[in-house]
Amino acid sequence: MELQLAIDLLNKEDAAELANKVKDYVDIVEIGTPIIYNEGLPAVKHMADNISNVKVLADMKIMDAADYEVSQAIKFGADVITILGVAEDASIKTAIEEAHKNNKQLLVDMIAVQDLEKRAKELDEMGADYIAVHTGYDLQAEGQSPLESLRTVKSVIKNSKVAVAGGIKPDTIKEIVAESPDLVIVGGGIANADDPVEAAKQCRAAIEGK
């Protein structure tokens, strides 16, 4: 089981600084969509240039022109790139192809997918590296959790890894870990903690069953 830190609300310098503080406890560091909107792909490059032994994910949430956008993210140092599960099949297939051609990985974000079971099966067959169930900020505010979605997707896929994101914190991560996802994505639960290193350490301990 892997742990990913999602960083959404910092500039690229502060993001790299935070990532380096917790890198002993995480496997993947994400440059979140808001940072990419604010600072562009150079934010991904800054992270890639300033951290080692950790994969860098660019949360592009690609919807179209997928092979080009994947190739650009890779050019700027991304190891993992995200595309939306609601994108056209053709877009997802070319994104997977482009990522794999460069020995990189593609994560498909299931945010706003209505028929999770059907889409997860399709994406699994297409060769997605990760399929991520994701309760976005706006639904978290309504009290929703990704737990049920995680169970649904995990029950139907054969090859892809299952990732889970959405409001996960050190004090709630154990119920997520109990469902055995392959990748747990924690954002504010680490980034906004009073002590991010301690929060990351607690999350790592939870996924290692300690």
From Swiss-Prot:
Gene3D superfamilies linked to this entry: Aldolase class I (3.20.20.70)
Domain of life: Bacteria
Pfam families membership: OMPdecase (PF00215)
Keyword Lyase: yes
Coiled-coil segments on the chain, per record: none
Pathway assigned to this chain's UniProt record: One-carbon metabolism; formaldehyde assimilation via RuMP pathway; D-fructose 6-phosphate from D-ribulose 5-phosphate and formaldehyde: step 1/2
Keywords: Carbohydrate metabolism, Lyase, One-carbon metabolism
Catalyzed reaction equations: D-ribulose 5-phosphate + formaldehyde = D-arabino-hex-3-ulose 6-phosphate
InterPro entries noted in UniProt: 3-hexulose-6-phosphate_synth, Aldolase_TIM, HPS/KGPDC, OMPdeCOase_dom, RibuloseP-bd_barrel
Swiss-Prot/TrEMBL GO biological process terms: 'de novo' pyrimidine nucleobase biosynthetic process; formaldehyde assimilation via ribulose monophosphate cycle; L-ascorbic acid catabolic process; one-carbon metabolic process
Xref: NCBIfam families: RuMP_HxlA (TIGR03128)
Function as written in the Swiss-Prot or TrEMBL entry: Catalyzes the condensation of ribulose 5-phosphate with formaldehyde to form 3-hexulose 6-phosphate.
Family according to the record: Belongs to the HPS/KGPDC family. HPS subfamily.
Name of the featured protein: 3-hexulose-6-phosphate synthase
UniProt organism field: Staphylococcus aureus (strain bovine RF122 / ET3-1)
